UniProtKB/Swiss-Prot annotation:
It comes from Caulobacter sp. (strain K31). PANTHER family: 60S RIBOSOMAL PROTEIN L11-RELATED. Keywords: Ribonucleoprotein, Ribosomal protein, RNA-binding, rRNA-binding, tRNA-binding. InterPro entries: Ribosomal_uL5 (IPR002132), Ribosomal_uL5_bac-type (IPR020930), Ribosomal_uL5_C (IPR031309), Ribosomal_uL5_CS (IPR020929), Ribosomal_uL5_dom_sf (IPR022803), Ribosomal_uL5_N (IPR031310). The keyword ATP-binding does not apply. One of its GO terms (cellular component) is ribosome. Disulfide bonds: none annotated. Belongs to the universal ribosomal protein uL5 family. Part of the 50S ribosomal subunit; part of the 5S rRNA/L5/L18/L25 subcomplex. Contacts the 5S rRNA and the P site tRNA. Forms a bridge to the 30S subunit in the 70S ribosome. One of its GO terms (molecular function) is structural constituent of ribosome. The gene is rplE. This is one of the proteins that bind and probably mediate the attachment of the 5S RNA into the large ribosomal subunit, where it forms part of the central protuberance. In the 70S ribosome it contacts protein S13 of the 30S subunit (bridge B1b), connecting the 2 subunits; this bridge is implicated in subunit movement. Contacts the P site tRNA; the 5S rRNA and some of its associated proteins might help stabilize positioning of ribosome-bound tRNAs. This is Large ribosomal subunit protein uL5. Gene3D superfamilies: 3.30.1440.10.
Length: 185
């Protein structure tokens, strides 16, 4: 009996349909020119947790549940007296997703999390950085199914950066549209 290795839905869709659609749309001559997803970076600023390290731990735990891997605590580089901040205090958390976990997260983001956002009218299509990377923000981390609403102590916002190998914003937007990103413009 041959074991079938599990492959995420969006990864198999990319190989089967999206690569061909991108090659046809942009008339690439080489397979390696076709843009693909490189990584997804999740960043959660937890500046309110400076005074309470327990809040920082719950934020790290929530980000770990959302991402499926352990986040790195980002620390303050220098002290700022006005914010009661000391060098080395935890001020955020970040995690970088690659390979299968990246495709799994993207699938949950597009199919489950974004439709659960209050008053969601679509994503801003102008949030590209000029090099084919897309950045977006969420005001609440409660939209993810891994977070239990009853056990939440505080609502955190988060930044999501989708990095692609696309050379231009136009190519990156076409790639993300193929992945069913709901752009408004």
């Amino acid at each position: 009996m041959v074991d079938q290795a599990y492959e995420p839905r969006l990864k198999s869709e990319y190989r089967a349909r999206i690569r061909a659609a991108m090659k046809e749309q942009f008339a690439y001559t080489n397979e390696m020119q076709i843009p693909k997803l490189d990584k997804i970076v999740l960043n959660m600023g937890i500046g309110e947790a400076v005074a309470d390290s327990k809040k920082a731990q719950t934020a790290l735990k929530d980000l770990m549940a959302i991402a499926g891997q352990k986040p790195v605590a980002t620390k303050a580089r220098k002290s700022i007296a006005g914010f009661k901040l000391r060098e080395g205090m935890v001020v955020g958390a970040k995690v970088t997703l690659r390979k299968d976990k990246m495709y799994e997260f993207l699938d949950r983001l597009v199919t489950i999390a974004l439709p659960r956002v209050k008053d969601f009218r679509g994503l801003n299509g102008k949030s590209f950085d000029g090099r084919g990377n897309y950045a977006m923000g969420l005001k609440e981390h409660l939209v993810f199914p891994e977070i239990n609403y009853d056990q939440i102590e505080q609502i955190w916002g988060m930044d999501i950066i989708v990095c692609t190998t696309a050379k231009t914003d136009q190519e990156a937007k076409a790639l993300l549209k193929e992945f069913q990103f709901p752009f408004t413009n």
